Swiss-Prot record:
UniProt protein name: UPF0229 protein BH1031
Record field: compositional bias (Gly residues): 103-113
Family: Belongs to the UPF0229 family.
NCBIfam families to which the protein is assigned, alphabetical: spore_yhbH (TIGR02877)
Source domain of life: Bacteria
Chain positions covered by the region annotation Disordered: 80-117
Pfam families on file: DUF444 (PF04285)
């Protein structure tokens, strides 16, 4: 460029490769997947892929509200209509969908001639679902009890000392100390640095008291609990255990399975083994009271019994159940009863509980898979939500 020229030139470098475009498309797609997960959370929570994953970090789940992009052929072969600058008014019908009255994909027994629904199968981490589900949940009526556990919440570096680990050296304060000492000795500057100039950051553990709690998970495993009923109950308890272990460090969980008799079982047996026989729900409540008397003093523990059944209890046992539920509530922060009743049939147990007015008693009837999510929201809703 000639001397004295007034023209200014700016050399810029921009990434015009396809890699940048691909990254933007990928990020936009991930945002769409997350939005679809939020909208479909009630259905996704009870997906069999999740419940049977044994807590694996990443799983594949179908998201039916997110289409798989592809070229579709127009089978109607009709001429299409556009809207121009004519004399049309708001509300005028400009065209009708010729396929509006046709039969779509359904769930009937006969064979159809329509294409099925396309859906996107996304890889989702359990942690993502937990973050969305657990953010609105908490143990209700959690109170401070005797002999609370002290839990280390975090570490604070809030003190400076002359002795410590070299990994915790405070460089800024060490340099300032050396400069001040050298200046007082008439040698302005940083060097030399002596051991007496070294400053180290030290920490304190910030602890908070956390009340102890125990959840008594009771499940009906009798013959009347079919495969779907047991799957729904186990789906709820699957998310309940993950919720408790994610948000609370001092919560014990006891697993009780019952038919006509109740017994304390391991977590693995609770989620995998099936049984048969009749149904006497009071046996589970008696076993829960035994555990409370033997191991969980109400003065030291917040107690939360949860019972899931299909409601098909021995009629003569309902009065005993009602009496034992009252006894459990006297020592509990909340009692939760979930009933898996897909076809709204008559339930002898829910009929006995319908007049319970104690605020510590909460119940929910599960009729479809999405009700697992709604039951979690009912039993573990936050206090401000409960008040409002």
């Amino acid at each position: 460029m000639k001397k004295g020229s007034r023209h200014n030139f700016v050399v810029s470098q921009e990434n015009w490769t396809l890699h940048r475009k691909g990254y933007q498309d990928q990020r936009r797609h991930q945002e769409k997947v997350k939005e679809a997960i939020r909208k479909n959370l009630p259905d996704l929570v009870s997906e069999e892929n999740i419940i049977m994953s044994n807590g694996r970090e990443v799983i594949k789940i179908p998201i039916r509200s997110l289409d798989e992009y592809k070229i579709r052929y127009n089978y109607d072969k009709n001429k299409h209509v556009g809207q121009g600058d004519g004399d049309s008014q708001v509300g005028d019908v400009i065209a009708r969908d010729p396929s509006a009255g046709q039969q779509g994909p359904g769930k009937g027994q006969g064979a159809g001639d329509q294409p099925g629904e396309d859906y996107f199968e996304a890889e989702v981490s359990i942690l993502e679902l937990e973050e969305l589900l657990f953010r609105e949940l908490e143990l209700p009526n959690l109170q401070q009890k005797e002999e609370d556990h002290l839990v280390v919440e975090h570490i604070e570096f809030n003190d400076i000392r002359k002795k410590g680990l070299m990994g915790n050296i405070d460089k800024r304060r060490t340099i300032l100390s050396a400069i001040k000492r050298n200046a007082l000795e008439g040698r302005p500057g940083l060097i030399p640095i002596y051991n007496d100039d070294l400053r180290f950051k030290t920490w304190n553990e910030v602890v908070r008291p956390e009340s102890k709690a125990v959840v008594l998970a009771m499940m009906d495993t009798s013959g009347s609990m079919g495969r779907w009923e047991k799957y729904m109950a186990r789906s709820f308890f699957f998310w309940m255990t993950r919720f408790l272990r994610t948000k609370y460090e001092t919560v014990d969980i006891e697993f009780i399975a019952h038919h006509t008799e109740a017994k304390v079982v391991s977590e693995e047996d609770f989620f995998s083994k099936g049984e048969s026989g009749g149904t006497i729900c009071s046996s589970a409540y008696r076993k829960a009271l035994e555990l409370i008397n033997e191991k969980y003093d109400p003065a030291r523990y917040n107690i939360y019994p949860f019972h899931f059944s299909d409601g098909d209890n021995l009629t003569s046992d309902n009065a005993r159940c009602l009496k034992l539920v009252h006894e459990l509530m006297e020592s509990s922060s909340m009692f939760g009863y979930g009933e898996v009743n897909q076809y709204s049939r008559h339930s002898t147990l829910m009929n006995a509980y319908k007049n319970l007015k104690d605020p510590r008693f909460r119940s929910y009837v599960l009729k479809e898979k999405g009700d697992v999510y709604r039951a979690m929201k009912t039993f573990f809703k936050k206090e401000e939500e409960a008040v409002s």
